[in-house]
């Protein structure tokens, strides 16, 4: 039954997906005499935490009850008071925590507060599932870098468009809808200037339940993106541009006047680790990279990705000049290429979605998540 209660808390936490960052996804359940008497989830950044909703719902029944929570309760004052204090005041006798919070503001302090108050604390229940739930938050807190997901759609022979650039549409509507879920769950959508010039995308989440739009990030070495592009003019979401030293200063001023945030790097090329460091400094914990091929190649070459989503359609495009999934410098030796482990293979309509994470190809250790 303990696993059932924690799984219920995990499912509750999912309701806040795409709405709580930079906060984690958290769900909580209050149980008394084997009955759920309170439940809650953190649904939006700045609003009440899961434990608050669950304990308030339980009311007086919280006294002597058990609390199941997906992440260690906070112990500090932020936008809301510390949940650990509320738990102590409520009379909860036992707390089951799936994962400890690596945030330096918490990092075991919540557990210590509860234990010093005489509350029994047990950790690790459904740890793996809870880690997966909050992989972006946990990765950011542990490494100081955003969680990076690479996404691409291609024909079965790995082509993302025909030789003429025609790419609408390679994959089915069902596959494109699936990708929208990840636009919702990531804080930033990133593409290169070539994608903007070729497709003029809006790069927004079109799901009806999307509470807020991810900020659009454009990598544009020479600041060549058209000033009439949708991402600069539609007002649907903020847009950030990373450009290299020597790019057009007057154009930068015009873009800034439009409300576009422009980051000018000190080098004549855009280095992916530097981009991620700047994003991290701005509190960004997740990035959804949608290409194009040279951008994907840069992330792969730099070893700067944590997950990969490739959608393959049952079509063949061919053509020597037709663009492929990944371009750029590539690798000169097989001993240097990144090895991946498939975590999921799913059929979505007529298409196949491959989900993978980087591995070193030897002992199964994840080489990029701890970079």
Swiss-Prot record:
Cofactor(s) this protein requires: Zn(2+)
Q: List UniProt keywords, sorted A-Z.
A: Hydrolase, Metal-binding, Multifunctional enzyme, NADP, Oxidoreductase, Riboflavin biosynthesis, Zinc
Enzyme Commission code = 3.5.4.26, 1.1.1.193
Q: What's a GO biological-process term for it?
A: riboflavin biosynthetic process
Instruction: State any single GO MF term.
Output: NADP binding
Q: Which reaction does it catalyse?
A: 2,5-diamino-6-hydroxy-4-(5-phosphoribosylamino)-pyrimidine + H2O + H(+) = 5-amino-6-(5-phospho-D-ribosylamino)uracil + NH4(+); 5-amino-6-(5-phospho-D-ribitylamino)uracil + NADP(+) = 5-amino-6-(5-phospho-D-ribosylamino)uracil + NADPH + H(+)
Which residues bind Zn(2+) per the record? Answer: 49, 74, 83
Q: Which residues form the CMP/dCMP-type deaminase domain?
A: 1-122
Which positions in this protein are listed as binding NADP(+)?
A: 153, 169, 195, 199, 221, 292-298
Kindly give the PROSITE patterns that the UniProt entry links to this protein. Answer: CYT_DCMP_DEAMINASES_1, CYT_DCMP_DEAMINASES_2
Q: How is the cofactor bound?
A: Binds 1 zinc ion.
Q: Output the CDD domains linked to this UniProt entry.
A: Riboflavin_deaminase-reductase
- Annotated Pfam families: dCMP_cyt_deam_1 (PF00383), RibD_C (PF01872)
Where are the residues of the annotated region Deaminase? Answer: 1-144
Region named Reductase: 145-371
Q: InterPro entries of this UniProt entry?
A: APOBEC/CMP_deaminase_Zn-bd, CMP_dCMP_dom, Cytidine_deaminase-like, DHFR-like_dom_sf, Eubact_RibD, RibD_C, RibDG_C, Riboflavin_Biosynth_HTPR
> Could you say which residues bind substrate here?
167, 183, 203, 206, 290
Q: Which family does it belong to?
A: In the N-terminal section; belongs to the cytidine and deoxycytidylate deaminase family. In the C-terminal section; belongs to the HTP reductase family.
What name appears for this protein in its UniProt entry? Answer: Riboflavin biosynthesis protein RibD
Organism from which the protein derives: Bacillus amyloliquefaciens (Bacillus velezensis)
Its lineage reads: Bacteria, Bacillati, Bacillota, Bacilli, Bacillales
């Amino acid at each position: 039954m303990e696993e059932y209660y924690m799984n219920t808390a995990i499912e509750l936490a999912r309701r806040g997906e795409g709405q709580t960052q930079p906060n984690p996804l958290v769900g909580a359940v209050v149980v008394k005499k084997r009955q759920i008497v309170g439940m809650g989830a953190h649904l939006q950044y700045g609003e009440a935490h899961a434990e608050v909703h669950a304990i308030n719902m339980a009311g007086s029944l919280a006294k002597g009850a058990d609390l199941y929570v997906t992440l260690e309760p906070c112990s500090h004052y932020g936008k809301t008071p510390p949940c650990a204090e509320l738990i102590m005041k409520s009379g909860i006798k036992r707390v089951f925590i799936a994962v400890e919070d690596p945030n330096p503001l918490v990092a075991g302090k919540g557990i210590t507060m509860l234990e010093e108050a005489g509350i029994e604390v047990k950790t690790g229940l459904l740890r793996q599932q809870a880690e997966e739930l909050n992989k972006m938050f946990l990765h950011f807190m542990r490494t100081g870098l955003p969680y990076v997901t690479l996404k691409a759609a291609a024909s079965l022979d790995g082509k993302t468009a025909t030789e003429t650039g025609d790419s609408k549409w390679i994959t089915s509507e069902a596959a494109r809808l699936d990708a929208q879920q990840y636009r919702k769950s990531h804080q930033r959508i990133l593409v290169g200037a070539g994608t903007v010039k070729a497709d003029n995308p809006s790069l927004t989440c079109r799901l009806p339940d999307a509470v807020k739009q991810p900020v659009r990030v454009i990598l544009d070495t020479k600041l060549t993106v058209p000033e009439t592009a949708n991402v600069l003019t539609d007002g649907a979401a903020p847009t950030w541009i990373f450009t290299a030293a020597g790019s057009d200063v007057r154009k930068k001023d015009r873009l800034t006047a439009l409300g576009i945030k422009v980051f000018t790097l000190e080098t004549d090329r855009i280095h992916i680790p530097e981009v991620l460091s700047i994003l991290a400094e701005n509190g960004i914990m997740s990035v959804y990279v949608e290409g194009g091929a040279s951008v994907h190649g840069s992330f792969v070459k730099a070893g700067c990705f944590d997950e990969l989503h490739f959608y393959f359609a049952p079509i063949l495009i061919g053509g020597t000049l037709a663009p492929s999934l990944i371009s750029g410098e590539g690798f000169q030796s097989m001993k240097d290429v990144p090895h991946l482990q498939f975590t999921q293979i799913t059929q979505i309509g007529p298409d196949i979605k491959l989900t993978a994470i980087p591995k070193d190809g030897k002992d199964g250790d994840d080489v990029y998540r701890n970079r």
